[in-house]
Amino acid sequence: MNNIVLILKMISKHYKQGNTIVRVLDGLNLTANEGELIAIIGSSGSGKSTLLHIAGLLDKPTNGQVIIPNIKYKKYHLIRLYYLGFIYQQHHLLKDFTALENVIIPRLIRGLDQKEAIKDATKILDDLGLEKKLYNMPGELSGGEQQRVAIARSLINKPRIILADEPTGNLDPNTTNEVFNLFLKVARKQNTTVIMVTHNHELAHKMDKLYNLKHGLLNIA
């Protein structure tokens, strides 16, 4: 049996709009195992991004628990730095840094050896088909290449969990499939758990598990 890396236990998130309580998440449960690829679909406004923010310790639930077993740190910013990786629809690359420099930044923030960081970043970028683009600036890269750099950056610290919010949402269909397949290849190679929210059902069906978020709860799709 795989090791459990994340438990969301009876998660609720409520907002007040005027005199009305909006129940975005309402007693939601999820268990993610090591190396598992999980997709979450749902209509716009169903709470998919809210769910990722709570799972990534970027937001607090109204009720419920987020449990990340067997971790050394208790402070949220350290848990995010050492155990979690994030990919968004926008790549958020630093425009004045090369592809390679963008990728090694999370390693340097942790105070790790720069030579080792460059070696590992070069390997990941190579796995993502960017071996000839290491020293290109973001503005010299295509949209798909920029997103691959962002993916490499999320993987450089070998996180237990990647939280991906529409990671290919800005790409054309052909580029979407190419980038996504490379992403899954590297994630599987690292045995990294991926929790992805998406509107793209074709991509969602490439994952190990598929859930539909509806009325604040997750159901197997």
From Swiss-Prot:
Q: Which cellular components does GO assign to this protein? A: plasma membrane
Location in the cell reads: Cell inner membrane
Q: What is its EC number?
A: 7.6.2.-
Keywords assigned by UniProt, alphabetized: ATP-binding, Cell inner membrane, Cell membrane, Membrane, Nucleotide-binding, Translocase, Transport
Q: Which InterPro entries match?
A: AAA+_ATPase (IPR003593), ABC_transporter-like_ATP-bd (IPR003439), ABC_transporter-like_CS (IPR017871), MacB-like_ATP-bd (IPR017911), P-loop_NTPase (IPR027417)
Q: Which PROSITE patterns did the record assign?
A: ABC_TRANSPORTER_1, ABC_TRANSPORTER_2, LOLD
User: Pfam families annotated for this entry?
Assistant: ABC_tran
- How does the UniProt record describe the way this protein sits in the membrane? Peripheral membrane protein
Predominantly, its location class is: membrane
Q: Name one GO molecular function term.
A: ATP hydrolysis activity
- UniProt entry tagged with the keyword Cell membrane: yes
Q: Where does ATP bind?
A: 42-49
- Which superkingdom, per the lineage? Bacteria
The UniProt subunit note reads as follows: The complex is composed of two ATP-binding proteins (LolD) and two transmembrane proteins (LolC and LolE).
Q: What does this protein do?
A: Part of the ABC transporter complex LolCDE involved in the translocation of mature outer membrane-directed lipoproteins, from the inner membrane to the periplasmic chaperone, LolA. Responsible for the formation of the LolA-lipoprotein complex in an ATP-dependent manner.
| UniProt name for this protein | Lipoprotein-releasing system ATP-binding protein LolD
Q: Which organism is it from?
A: Rickettsia prowazekii (strain Madrid E)
Q: What is the lineage of its organism?
A: Bacteria, Pseudomonadati, Pseudomonadota, Alphaproteobacteria, Rickettsiales
